From Swiss-Prot:
Protein source organism: Plasmodium falciparum (isolate 3D7)
Biotechnology annotation for this entry: Possible candidate for an effective malaria vaccine as determined by epitope response in sera.
Biased composition (Low complexity): 615-629
Identification of the protein by name: Uncharacterized protein PF3D7_0207100
Annotated region described as Disordered, given as residue ranges: 522-635
Coiled coil: 1080-1110
Biased composition (Polar residues): 524-574
Basic residues bias spans: 582-612
Keywords: Coiled coil, Merozoite
GO cellular component: cytoplasm; membrane
Length: 1745
């Protein structure tokens, strides 16, 4: 099985990582699994790694067990068959047609380990609606109203569900304004639709789904992520009067209405492929979009006006309007259409409405040709990305052909990326943006309306002024609202994607976004300055948004905005560039003068300078305001998003806790007002100097700092000497504040981090750098780092990354492993480039990997943390440090570095240097000042225990450790052993890195001497006969660890090779450390060495530094290297996720078109199936749940009744009444002197004294054991556990004490058995003695009983020592046997499971085990319930709390101990028991303490809760048994299938990680299991016991009320009965008189009198007194009647002579047999008893009591 550990790769997705990166929409995860099964063989976009460097070419995909979106595959070597099946498809006439031009992503996209990811468009779970109005109320003249969006989280069940997105046909009177703003409600994520005319294909129908209520207000369709965008945050709807008639038709809206003359069809086209393959269809596509989307209403109004025909007439005048508008606004359209998308690096939004439809058609092919000629001339300035060069060239040519062939631009609709996690955050912002409802600022609303209507530049000059004002007002609204609220959250950068006219063009040319001329950049620069000026002008006031000065500036300079020729614009731009350069030089000179001032002054000056710069640039930038109006809108929105990050930088961290979206994990630029202008200036210089080959090594002036997170916006970083870097645009996400984010995706972009770091450095270089520092230096360093991050090389990072003094590379040697903690502030070159080079050559491995000089600091830090390494594992090192107060024979003069390494962990904390050791505790990390961006925030958030390395990493580790062994040279020699007679034995001398090992053979090591401890190595004698043989001695310092003493030891060796002596001598001279005696010699040597060169002094210093290195054993090396590679793997996993995210955003439109083309054909059928499928599932689940509950209730009732009548009640009576029956029968057998009271006194006294003495024994033994060992080991813990068992199970102990005297406890609690046998034997003897001396003892009193118990305790004290010896022996023997058996069985089962890994078989087995365990557990719970009830003396006054506490504690302990402790813990810990026995017992103790606390706290709290609130009880009508059944059912749900599956996965995981993980994984799993158990108990048990307690109290109150009513009735009945008695006496007197009369008349009229007599007697006769009183007799006093009517209440019956008979063991019915017959196994004949008593008396007489 050893060879399999490199062949399999498993991803265990469990633990802190809540959500993988591909699960973006939470609501869509489990619903689309069956829908997407048909897409398995469809062409998938692939992200290939460097295939040439991976010989196996295996594709590793991360798998979610229940998801089919991303599948785990290990492809075979022959992938040709699958490649043949791959093809692109397009939809033509509702059929699949393969495309010849097959576009794939470049196979060498990035250095990732994932080769294939399946990207599938998911149906959008929209969180918005569109308000539609009936046709009957439409008017020809209407106005657009803008309503602020609000979140409809209260109707999320219907709104955000996937089957409500595209649904059925709308009613006849419901219509919709199909506008560019609201069309996106019908779209999928990352998908684009278009609409065609009547000539297109068949119609599309949708299913009906009425899932929403009517008459909703403020219906929204916008995404939560678009809160901060100005124009995308508002939706338009017409006719606000009809607001109450809204039906939520955005789920029922159709593209095609049967009664509508203007039909539409929905199709999806690819943005690039469609333009390239079919130019004619593209032109039709443009015309159709223009016609359909710009029509006001697509339906006929009630007045009979055909609006479609009316719009067709408008089309006739289209060409004339185009020509007029073209002459006026050629230049403005040129700038708005093409320059804005090129300059727009962020996902800004430009809204296009239907009012200015002609302006979109004002482009000609000549102008486009000019643009692309300029773009092609400047394409050298594209970022040098090796893997994308070929793709960029293809995209340039393709984009040029597509746009040239298209006569009109593409007017696409908007796509909004849905983020369901921002719902709560959106609710918080809802009240501050309700413009359409409250109308707080009417001016702002009107301005926003104008802004929505006027998106194009082709308007008069006066209109342009209004647009500028409107933009500034909209920005001011956002800025002021941000100032009012401090809880704003950072805007999601990718959430504002909207596909409209400009965005479509921008996405086509996205790869050319950096291809710009210097002239265009100057225009952009003015735009940035102008946007910053606008913000400064309008940030102070809320309503007075624009001042008169700005209006004058805009209006006065509007005439200069437009030029007839392009050359004028270019010349103006060139002049702008020169002016900006001059202005920049002046700023640099001013700022360099102020660099030595304090930080506070620098902050004030920075604020004043930003204002001055904005004011100076204000008048200069007015000339190009109108030219770049489109740029201004885009850049202003970009500034708006960035300002959100500015103002919320300090407070935004707390809000980011709720946002777990991967898109929000980025380093947002913290821009200030004048930062954009400086950024553009720096970029101009960088682009102009790209091709210069003068790369200056300016790394000595820079350092990647250790960034400390503060609440303020600025990060002040300490750098060596006088340099100080102040960062404004680098946001550090703290671990504590970003816990949720880092759990999901602990990664950042490498290249993006470098860009942001150096851009921020360039922004502030005016205050940082000296006069000699140039922008070229910074740029060259950035480019070098980016090459090393993206390329294949590894060596450039060491030299170019950091400086000589502060760098990480300078502190390392050639033969040293570049571990993480060797330098605290920096990344290591090997860490950065490990995943790119999995199988290096042997030479490279020898240079980079093969080294064994591991610093002791790394191992010491592990040991100090106390998590991974314990005292049993750490190898004893001879050179271990002594305490500070102890004086050694030899003191080493450590330098500062070694002092830090050997200092304790507390001293390291006091120095305030936080190491990057990933094993540090969280509390210790928070105390430190510095944080490392890569490790603290990302690596520590990943659960290392769930991480596995792939095969190549294991091979690296194995190869590296083997090289450590290979470098150790061994020589054969002889060593002197004898003292008097010289006797030499053959040995092996092994020259290790820092130790000299002397071995007798390969297995037996004689000693291990550190080179630093060797004092002298000399040749003693050379043999005259054999010249090669010689004697040499080694004198070293021997240190005793316990006594802390040292002494010199001399060893004699005899060898034939002089090489041995030379090697040892060289190692000792290299590592020699001067002692106190040599200080004087050093002082003399220093005087002589003054004349030496600097190089020799440096070499000596470097030799002295190596004295801190020590030899570490191979096992420790394995552990450390594995931990290192794990963290490297986590780092690369983060980088990989970020790269995949970047590529996913870049190519998502193209791939979504491709998938949508395939998904389009069968989506109608899937929609029909969805509704039926979901309804069917809900119906079946509801029915199954109801049937299961009904069956379980019936089953429990059946089990309770049968078990109650069969065995449980008899067992209870037998155990609880045993003592009473024994004493009662013995009393009747011998004499009557011993009464019942005295027997009860004896019972109670013996029990209490027994309990006290046992507690004393436990405490004394534990105390003595702690004194000896200073730790609670396993034996001491068994005693404490036994004591807790005695306290918890008092009733069970009583029954066992006086019934069987035999106990069957488990291994750990065997101490109970031993003490019972010793102590109870004495109690029985004392009882027999009392019974035998019945003649002499007349009365038994309490004093005699106490005296007897004291005598018994003295006897038991004498036997205590032997009992403990027996216990100790038995515990360890039984534990070893049982643990061995359990481990063997479980390991065998685990091996079989892993070898025969079948998913179906595993699920079946888990189901069977689950059912079996639940069935057994239910029966056990019922048995324990009736066992623990105990004898109840009084039925009316019953202590419910005690009874239910005992039930809960007993059941919980039994289940947890048997199912968890003896199976899981013993299996996991047995594998570690060889080295960690103390750890084993400590873990078990923690679990036991936790369970005890839960029993005490939870139950008592629930009982108190029931007493306070009895009226909220919902099971009032149920009986006690039914309530308990419900509690048991709730309790059983705790142990579900998930825990069993996790347990099997852990076994599978431990199988492959056993030799590496050892202790840490086992203990970590235990702690995690305890945490899960604690959480489950709190969630399940509280409700169960609340039910029980509420029922009890309710029943008690109900019974009390009934009893009071019965008493009142009985009193009334007694009064009535007394009156009736008086009347009856009077009636008796009258009857006697009547009898006399009747006798007289009997003779005359016998027949008639007889008949009358009988009637009168029958009617007048009253019931007898017995009948009268029995009728109203209280039935509760008669236990027999209660048992017949309520058999469950038998346990409440009193102890009476009627109930003293015992039941037979075999039969469940009561028996009247004698006690001697029933307990024949316990009692013999009377003669034998008398003999035993006689023998007992003889023995007791010999004992000294």
């Amino acid at each position: 099985m050893d060879s399999d550990k490199y062949k399999k790769f498993y991803v265990y997705n469990h633990g802190f990582t809540k959500q993988p990166f591909y699960e973006r929409n939470l609501n869509d995860k489990g619903i689309h699994l069956k829908e997407l099964k048909r897409l398995e063989r469809v062409d998938e976009p692939r992200l290939y790694n460097n295939v040439d460097k991976i010989p196996n070419k295996k594709e590793i995909i991360y798998n979610n067990i229940k998801s089919n979106n991303i599948q785990v595959r290990v492809n075979q070597n022959n992938n040709e068959e699958k490649k043949k099946e791959e093809a692109n498809y397009t939809c033509v006439n509702n059929k699949y047609v393969t495309l010849k031009n097959k576009v794939h992503v470049n196979k060498y996209v990035n250095n990732s380990n994932i080769n294939k990811i399946k990207i599938v468009p998911i149906i959008k779970c929209s969180n918005y609606k569109i308000k539609n109005n009936p046709i009957s109320h439409l008017k020809s003249n209407y106005e657009n109203k803008f309503v602020k969006l609000s979140n409809f989280s209260n109707i999320k069940n219907g709104c955000s569900h996937k089957d409500n997105v595209i649904n059925e046909t709308m009613d006849q009177h419901k219509s919709e304004q199909l506008n560019n703003d609201n069309i996106k409600k019908l779209l999928y994520d990352y998908c684009i639709f278009r609409e065609d005319t009547i000539k297109t294909k068949t119609n599309i129908s949708y299913n009906k789904m009425n899932s929403f209520k009517d008459n909703e207000e403020n219906i929204n369709y916008m995404d939560n992520n678009n809160i901060k965008s100005n124009s995308s945050s508002y939706c338009s709807y017409s006719n606000k009067i009809n607001q109450n008639n809204v039906n939520h038709t955005h789920l029922k809206t159709e593209f095609l209405n049967e009664k509508n003359s203007h039909t539409q069809n929905e199709q999806s086209i690819p943005l690039l492929d469609g333009l390239q393959n079919n130019h004619n269809s593209a032109t039709k596509f443009h015309n159709n979009i223009y016609d359909n989307n710009n029509s006001l209403v697509n339906y006929k109004s009630d007045k009979g006006i055909d609006l479609h025909n009316k719009m067709m007439k408008i089309e006739t005048d289209k060409n004339g309007i185009i020509t007029l508008e073209k002459k006026k606004h050629d230049e403005k359209y040129y700038n708005n259409i093409f320059l804005n998308p090129l300059n727009d690096n962020s996902n800004n939004v430009v809204i296009t409405t239907c009012d200015n439809k002609e302006s979109y058609r004002n482009s000609t092919s000549d102008m486009i040709n000019k643009i692309f000629e300029k773009m092609m001339n400047e394409k050298k300035n594209i970022l040098k990305m090796k893997n994308f060069n070929d793709v960029i060239k293809k995209k340039i040519t393709m984009a040029k052909e597509k746009i040239l062939n298209s006569n009109s631009t593409i007017n696409m609709k908007k796509v909004s990326f849905y983020n369901s996690k921002d719902e709560d955050l959106f609710n918080e912002k809802e009240n501050s943006y309700k413009y359409g409802v409250k109308r707080e600022n009417q001016e702002d609303i009107n301005v926003i309306k104008n802004n929505m209507k006027r998106n194009n530049i082709n308007i008069d000059n006066n209109d342009n002024i209004n647009i500028i004002k409107n933009d500034s007002v909209s920005k001011n609204i956002h800025i002021n609202n941000k100032k009012k609220r401090d809880d704003d959250f950072p805007f999601n950068n990718s959430a504002g994607l909207l596909l409209d006219f400009d965005l479509c063009k921008r996405k086509v040319l996205e790869i050319l976004k950096n291809v710009q001329s210097s002239k265009k950049k100057n225009k952009i620069l003015t735009n940035h300055n102008h946007s910053s000026d606008n913000q400064n002008c309008h940030s102070s006031d809320n309503q007075n948004c624009h001042s008169s000065d700005n209006q004058n500036c805009h209006s006065s300079d509007n005439q200069n905005c437009h030029s007839s020729d392009n050359q004028n614009c270019d010349s103006n731009a060139c002049n702008k560039k020169d002016e900006e350069k001059k202005r920049k030089k002046k700023k640099i000179k001013k700022k360099n003068k102020m660099k030595n001032k304090s930080n506070n002054k620098s902050k004030n000056k920075r604020e004043t300078k930003s204002k001055k710069i904005s004011n100076n640039n204000n008048n200069d930038n007015m000339n190009n305001q109108c030219d770049n109006m489109g740029d201004q809108r885009i850049n202003n929105e970009n500034m708006d998003k960035q300002n959100v990050n500015i103002q919320n930088e300090g407070n935004g961290f707390n809000n980011n806790k709720n946002n777990n979206d991967l898109l929000n994990v980025y380093i947002s630029p913290n821009m200030i007002n004048h930062s954009l202008s400086s950024t553009c200036e720096k970029k101009n210089k960088e682009d102009n100097k790209m091709n210069d080959n003068k790369f200056l090594n300016s790394s000595s002036k820079m350092k990647i700092p250790e960034i400390s997170t503060n609440n303020s916006n600025e990060k002040i970083v300490n750098v060596s000497n006088d340099e100080m870097l102040v960062y404004h645009n680098l946001t550090v996400l703290n671990v504590k504040e970003q816990g949720g984010v880092t759990e999901e995706s602990s990664c950042i972009k490498r290249t993006y981090f470098v860009d942001q770091f150096y851009d921020s450095y360039n922004m502030r270089n005016e205050k940082i750098t000296d006069d000699n520092m140039q922008v070229e230096d910074i740029y060259n360093v950035k480019e070098n780092i980016k090459r090393t991050l993206k390329g294949d090389g590894h060596d450039d990072v060491k030299t170019n990354m950091l400086s000589e003094d502060n760098s990480y590379a300078s502190g390392l040697w050639g033969n040293e492993i570049n571990f993480i903690s060797n330098n605290e502030n920096c990344l290591n070159s090997y860490d950065i480039s490990c995943d790119e080079k999995y199988i290096p050559n042997e030479e490279e491995q020898d240079e980079e990997l093969c080294s064994n000089n591991i610093l002791v600091k790394d191992i010491e830090e592990k040991k100090m943390c106390g998590k991974l390494f314990f005292e049993e594992i750490c190898v004893f090192r001879i050179n271990e440090k002594n305490e500070h107060g102890h004086e050694n024979l030899r003191k080493n003069n450590h330098n500062d570095d070694t002092h830090k390494m050997y200092s304790s962990y507390e001293n390291i904390q006091n120095i305030n240097k936080q190491s990057t050791n990933p094993f540090c505790k969280k509390d210790e990390m928070e105390k430190s000042q510095g944080t490392n961006l890569f490790y603290d925030n990302y690596i520590n958030s990943v659960d290392i225990t769930k991480l596995e390395l792939n095969k190549n990493c294991y091979q690296h580790i194995n190869y590296e450790v083997q090289n450590l062994i290979k470098k150790e040279n061994s020589y054969a020699a002889e060593m002197n052993v004898g003292l008097v007679f010289r006797k030499y034995i053959p040995i092996l001398i092994n020259l290790s890195c820092n130790y000299l090992l002397i071995k007798k053979n390969e297995k037996n090591v004689i000693t291990c001497i550190s080179y630093t401890n060797i004092i002298d190595v000399k040749i003693v004698k050379k043999s005259k006969k054999n010249k090669e043989r010689f004697l040499f001695k080694i004198v070293y310092v021997f240190k005793k660890k316990e006594q802390k003493t040292e002494k010199n030891v001399t060893l004699l060796f005899r060898a034939n090779l002089m090489e041995i002596f030379e090697k040892i001598k060289g190692r000792v001279d290299y590592c020699i450390i001067p002692n106190e005696d040599d200080k004087n010699i050093q002082l003399q040597d220093k005087k002589k060495k003054k004349g030496k060169k600097k190089k020799e002094l440096q070499e000596e210093k470097m030799k002295k530094k190596k004295k801190t290195q020590e030899y570490v054993d191979i096992e420790t090396v394995y552990e450390y290297v594995i931990e290192k590679y794990k963290r490297v793997h986590v780092l690369y996993l983060g980088r990989l996720l970020q790269i995949v995210e970047k590529l996913f955003k870049k190519y998502i439109l193209k791939y979504s078109f491709h998938k949508l083309r395939i998904f389009y054909e069968y989506k109608i059928e899937m929609e029909k199936l969805k509704k039926n499928y979901i309804h069917c599932i809900y119906d079946i689940s509801d029915k199954l749940e109801f049937l299961i509950k009904k069956k379980m209730q019936h089953y429990f009732n059946h089990i309770i009744i049968n078990s109650y009548e069969s065995s449980f009640i008899n067992y209870q009576i037998k155990t609880n009444d045993m003592l009473y029956n024994l004493l009662l029968k013995e009393k009747s057998a011998y004499q009557n002197h011993l009464g019942k009271n005295y027997i009860l006194i004896l019972y109670k006294v013996l029990l209490s004294m027994y309990k006290k003495k046992m507690a004393i024994y436990f405490r004394s033994f534990v105390y003595n054991n702690i004194k000896v060992s200073k730790k609670k080991n396993a034996f001491a813990y068994t005693l404490t556990r036994v004591n807790s068992i005695l306290v918890l199970y008092e009733r069970r102990i009583k029954s066992f004490i006086f019934s069987k005297l035999k106990f069957n406890y488990d291994n750990v609690s065997y101490f109970c058995f031993t003490m019972y046998k010793i102590y109870l034997r004495r109690i029985l003897f004392g009882y027999l003695r009392i019974r035998d001396n019945r003649i002499n003892i007349k009365n038994v009193i309490e004093k005699n009983v106490y005296r007897l118990v004291k005598l018994i305790s003295k006897i038991s004290d004498n036997h205590k020592y032997n009992a403990f010896l027996k216990l100790q022996k038995y515990v360890y023997e039984q534990n070893e046997k049982k643990n061995k058996m359990i481990c063997d069985n479980l390991i065998y089962a685990n091996n079989e499971l892993c070898n025969n890994l079948d998913k179906i078989a595993i699920e079946k087995g888990i189901n069977q085990i689950d059912c079996l365990i639940k069935f057994k557990r239910k029966e056990c719970l019922m048995k324990y319930f009736y066992t623990l009830k105990g004898p109840q003396i009084n039925t009316e006054r019953f202590y419910y709390c005690i009874r239910y506490c005992s039930i809960f504690s007993f059941v919980l302990n039994k289940i947890i101990q048997k199912k968890v402790q003896h199976i899981f813990f013993q299996f996991v810990l047995k594998t570690l028991q060889r080295n960690n026995k103390n750890r084993l017992t400590h873990a078990i103790k923690l679990l036991q303490v936790l369970v005890q606390k839960k029993e005490k706290k939870s139950v008592i709290d629930v009982l108190q809760l029931y007493d306070k609130y009895p009226y909220i009880f919902q099971y009032k009508d149920l009986t006690k048994i039914e309530v308990f059944v419900i509690c048991v059912q709730n309790f059983v749900t705790l142990y579900n299938r998930k825990l069993l599956l996790n347990f099997l996965l852990k076994l599978h995981y431990l199988k492959y990680q056993e030799q590496f993980m050892k202790t840490y994984n086992g203990i970590g799993s235990i702690y995690k299991f305890v945490h899960v158990l604690d959480k489950k108990l709190m969630n399940t048990i509280r409700e169960s016991f609340r039910v029980i307690l509420q029922n009890d109290k309710f029943l008690r109150e109900k019974m009390n009320m009934k009893m009071e009513q019965m008493d009142m009735k009985m009193e009334k009945i007694d009064v009535n009965m007394d009156q009736m008695d008086v009347k009856m006496e009077q009636m008796d007197v009258k009857m006697e008189q009547m009898d006399v009369k009747m006798k007289r008349m009997n003779k005359k009229k016998s027949k008639q009198i007889h008949v009358n007599y009988n009637n009168k007697a029958y009617s007048s006769s009253s019931p007898s007194p017995m009948l009268r009183y029995n009728k109203y007799k209280d039935m509760s006093s008669n236990s027999a009647s209660l048992i017949k009517k309520y058999p469950f209440l038998i346990y409440n019956s009193e102890i009476s002579p009627d109930c003293t008979t015992m039941a037979d063991d075999k039969l469940s019915l009561p028996s009247n047999e004698s006690v001697t017959h029933i307990f024949s196994y316990a009692y013999e004949d009377m003669d034998k008893i008398k003999k035993k008593i006689y023998d007992f008396n003889n023995k007791m007489s010999n004992v000294d009591l």
